[in-house]
Amino acid sequence: MTVQQRRRPPIASRETLQALLSEGAQALGVALSDAQRGALLDYVALLAKWNAVYNLTAIRDPRQMLIQHILDSLSIVPHLGAHGAAAAALDVGSGGGLPGVVLAIALPGWRVTLNDIVHKKSAFQNQAKAELKLGNLSVVTGRVETLRPGADVPAKFDVIVSRAFADLADFVTLARHLVAPGGSIWAMKGVRPDEEIGRLPDGARVKQMIRLTVPSLDAERHLIEVELDEAI
């Protein structure tokens, strides 16, 4: 056994991950069925399996994937509830499918579209869609600013969300043409992004800024909702 092997942390069992997921979801106030929990654990397994091929995340440990990716993504679910049980969401710069795949599992009545410019990441997203049997999930490859409602995507979206995609002002500028009436843009951030907020373009303003607490994660997390004049 090599030194590296001796130092490598043991891989958590599915039962351990399931307990961590159940406790975390309960702490977040997100109700999940057995099938939904199973799908989220299957998604973690897919991320771990295909990470070396698709370069999806710097995190290699499934336990940390569950905390830093799944629970982190689940933390926004209660705050998106105002859009109802049947909203349309676009996940911009989705990468390995975060938070969009998690939203599609946790909110089965929603129609979720994943967007990325990297074809191999879109390939993984389609793989996840097929293996997890997510009929409410779709994938579109290309720059968000070039997507046309009614052509590249079916229509405008009630929710446009990103997780560490870009500077907040850039995100709003690139995606605002895709926001449906009554919809808004949601940005998942680490530390409170006051400087980014100060650079928001005309006609865009922060509607709410929510400090998130993610179970088992000792790091700052904020969720910013931006409303637009043209979508009110």
Curated annotation (Swiss-Prot):
Top-rank lineage group of the source organism: Bacteria
Name of the top EC class for this enzyme: transferase
Name the record gives this protein: Ribosomal RNA small subunit methyltransferase G
CDD domains in the record: AdoMet_MTases (cd02440)
Pfam family, one: GidB
Similarity-based family: Belongs to the methyltransferase superfamily. RNA methyltransferase RsmG family.
TM ranges: none
GO molecular function: rRNA (guanine-N7-)-methyltransferase activity
InterPro entries noted in UniProt: rRNA_ssu_MeTfrase_G (IPR003682), SAM-dependent_MTases_sf (IPR029063)
Binding site for S-adenosyl-L-methionine: 93, 98, 144-145, 163
Keywords: Cytoplasm, Methyltransferase, rRNA processing, S-adenosyl-L-methionine, Transferase
Reaction(s) the record says it catalyses: guanosine(527) in 16S rRNA + S-adenosyl-L-methionine = N(7)-methylguanosine(527) in 16S rRNA + S-adenosyl-L-homocysteine
A single GO cellular-component term on record: cytosol
HAMAP family: 16SrRNA_methyltr_G
Cellular location(s): Cytoplasm
EC number: 2.1.1.170
Summary of the function given for this chain in its UniProt record: Specifically methylates the N7 position of guanine in position 527 of 16S rRNA.
